[in-house]
């Protein structure tokens, strides 16, 4: 039980540290880009 608690606590501390210091990719922007790409592929070229 003690080993589990130590591992759990250490994991949380490391996770919080990484979350604060690691620049997360902007998922909302990525989704918008993917949507635009899909819409562009669906539309036939108007030439």
UniProtKB/Swiss-Prot annotation:
Transmembrane segments: 7-23
A single cellular component GO annotation: mitochondrial intermembrane space
The entry's keywords: Immunity, Innate immunity, Membrane, Mitochondrion, Mitochondrion inner membrane, Mitochondrion outer membrane, Transmembrane, Transmembrane helix
Biological processes annotated in GO: innate immune response; mitochondrial cytochrome c oxidase assembly; mitochondrial respirasome assembly; mitochondrial respiratory chain complex III assembly; positive regulation of interleukin-1 beta production; positive regulation of NLRP3 inflammasome complex assembly
Signal peptide: none
Stated induction or repression of this protein's expression: Down-regulated by TLR ligands, including bacterial lipopolysaccharide (LPS), in bone marrow-derived macrophages.
Pfam families per the UniProt record, alphabetical: DUF4535
Disulfide bonds: none
Membrane topology of the entry: Single-pass membrane protein
Phenotype on disruption: Mice were born at expected Mendelian ratios and do not show any visible phenotype, displaying normal heart function and cardiac dimensions. Cells however display defects in complex III activity and metabolic perturbations in the heart, as well as altered complex III assembly into respiratory supercomplexes.
UniProt main location, coarse: mitochondrion
Tissue specificity comment: Widely expressed, with highest levels in lung, skeletal muscle and heart. Expressed in bone marrow-derived macrophages (at protein level).
Family to which the UniProt record says this protein belongs: Belongs to the STMP1 family.
Quaternary structure and partners: Interacts with components of the ubiquinol-cytochrome c oxidoreductase (cytochrome b-c1 complex, complex III, CIII), such as UQCRC1/QCR1, UQCRC2/QCR2 and UQCR10/QCR9. Interacts with components of the cytochrome c oxidase (mitochondrial respiratory chain complex IV) complex, such as MT-CO2.
Name of protein: Short transmembrane mitochondrial protein 1
């Amino acid at each position: 039980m003690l080993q589990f608690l130590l591992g759990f606590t250490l994991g949380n501390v490391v996770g919080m540290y990484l979350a604060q210091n690691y620049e997360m990719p902007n998922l909302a922007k990525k989704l918008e880009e993917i949507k635009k790409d899909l819409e562009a592929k669906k539309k036939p070229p108007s030439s």
